[in-house]
Amino acid sequence: PYGATLEVKDNSGYAYVGLRLNGNVQAGIYDSRFVGNQAQAYAAAGGFSTGSYADLNYCLVAGNQANLNGGTANAGGFSVWSGSWGNFYQCTFAANSAEYGSALTVGRGSSATVDGSIIWNNPGDNALAAVQWDNNGSNLDVYNSVVQGGESGMYADELSNIYYDGLLDMDPFFCDPANGDFSIDVLSSAITPWGEPMGALGYGCEGTVMAAAHILSVEDVPNDQGGRVYVTFEKSLFDTDGLSRTEMYTI
C-alpha cells in the first residue's frame, strides 16, 4: 500500500512484531506510530526483508524492545534485511532497545537512508548499524539528523558502510518523553537545513530549553574590601533588547 497511516502499538512476538514486508512488495507509510512493541529476538517495531521496499515519512518509532530472550539480536526499531531498501524521512526513533542497532539495523546486502530525523536515547551498543551477513555488506546514509553520540552512535562492520552528512549530536529537547510526547521545544536546535523541525512531530512546547550562557570575563576590583566582582556574559537565548526579567543564566 502507498499512503498508509498506521498505529501499531503494544504487540509482542518472536520477531518482525509490529510490521513486516517480505518479498517483492512496496509500501509508503506516512504519519504513523510504532510504539511499545516487544520482540524476543529482532525487529520489534518491524522489518523489511527479501527485496522489499519501504518509504516511511513522519513516523514515530518509540519504546520498542528487541532481544528480550537475552541473545545478541538487533533492531528494537526497524530492520532492513536481505536485499531490501528503506527510506526514513523526518522520523523520530526514541527509547528503542536491542543489543545493537537499537533504532535501525541494515543488513545482508540492504540499503537505507535516514534524513531529517531524530535518533535519541536508544539503549544498546549503537543506535544505527549496517552489517554483513553471509558476506553481503550493507549501506546506510544519514543526512541532516540528530544522532545521539554522533559518529560513535553508529556502527558499520568491515563489509558495510555508513555515509553521513549534516550530523548533529545534541539534545533535541523532547517536550514530555516520559509521557510519550516526542514533539520538540520551539527553541530546539534540531532544525533541518530547509528550516523545518527534525523528526516526526514538529514543535509541541516551549520552556524546556535552559541554555547556559558562557562567561566572557571575570574582573575583581582590587582594594574594594571584597565588595564587588564584575562578571560579563555573552547574550543568552532568552535575552531581550529592552529591560525585563526574562534573562536566565546558569552559573
Describe the predicted segments one by one.
Residues 129, 157-158, 200-207:
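Short, flexible loop/turn segments with low-complexity composition
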Residues 1-10, 209-215:
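Short intrinsically disordered, low-complexity coil segments enriched in acidic
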Residues 164-206:
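C-terminal accessory segments
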Residues 63, 196-198, 225:
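Short secondary-structure junctions and interdomain/linker hinges
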Residues 140, 184-185, 213, 246:
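A broad, structural micro-motif
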Residues 208-245:
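Pro/Thr/Ser/Gly-rich low-complexity, intrinsically disordered linker/stalk tracts
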Residues 5-9, 15, 20-181:
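Predominantly extracellular beta-rich ligand-binding scaffolds that present long acidic/polar faces
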Residues 248-250:
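Beta-strand signatures of extracellular beta-sandwich domains
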